[in-house]
UniProtKB/Swiss-Prot annotation:
Pfam families: Pterin_4a (PF01329)
InterPro entries in alphabetical order: PCD_sf, Pterin-4-alpha-carb_dehyd, Pterin_deHydtase
Name the record gives this protein: Putative pterin-4-alpha-carbinolamine dehydratase
NCBIfam families on file: PRK00823.1-1 (NF002016)
Keyword Cell inner membrane: no
GO MF annotations, alphabetized: 4-alpha-hydroxytetrahydrobiopterin dehydratase activity
BP-aspect Gene Ontology terms: tetrahydrobiopterin biosynthetic process
Enzyme Commission code: 4.2.1.96
Record key words, sorted: Lyase
Catalytic activity field: (4aS,6R)-4a-hydroxy-L-erythro-5,6,7,8-tetrahydrobiopterin = (6R)-L-erythro-6,7-dihydrobiopterin + H2O
Classification via CDD domains: PCD_DCoH_subfamily_a
Protein family: Belongs to the pterin-4-alpha-carbinolamine dehydratase family.
Top EC class for this record: lyase
Length: 113
């Protein structure tokens, strides 16, 4: 498999399949700091990123926002002093699509600098 961070998001339709559990487990190996959580019955990928201060956390939030605009896929972002929680899922299918794993990997690359 090509590294997830090198891939681009596919256009996702409402009838697109959710990622099967076995595929999700394989893709999670590339993004080991992410966790799958369930919110109101919807599976999501989530990770907390730590920063020295609010300004660094805000800058990262804006960088992720720019990536989201470029890829046409948008996360939930929770900004606090010294941390940003990023949560990816595909609204149209109410669950996880390959795009979410791609974007999680891209988010990791942004954080690594």
């Amino acid at each position: 498999m090509t590294d997830l961070y090198q891939q681009t998001c596919e256009v996702c339709r409402a009838d697109a399949p959710r990622v099967p559990v076995d595929e999700a487990e394989v893709m999670l190996e590339e993004i080991p700091l992410w966790r799958i959580q369930q919110q109101e019955g919807v599976k999501q990928l989530a990770r907390n990123f730590k920063f020295k201060n609010f300004i660094e956390a805000l800058a990262f939030t804006n960088t992720v926002a720019n990536l989201a605009e470029e890829e046409g896929h948008h996360p939930k972002l929770v900004l606090e002093w010294g941390s940003v929680e990023v949560v990816w899922w595909t609204h149209k299918i109410k669950g996880l699509h390959k795009n979410d794993f791609v974007m999680a990997a891209k988010t990791d690359k942004l954080y690594e600098g």
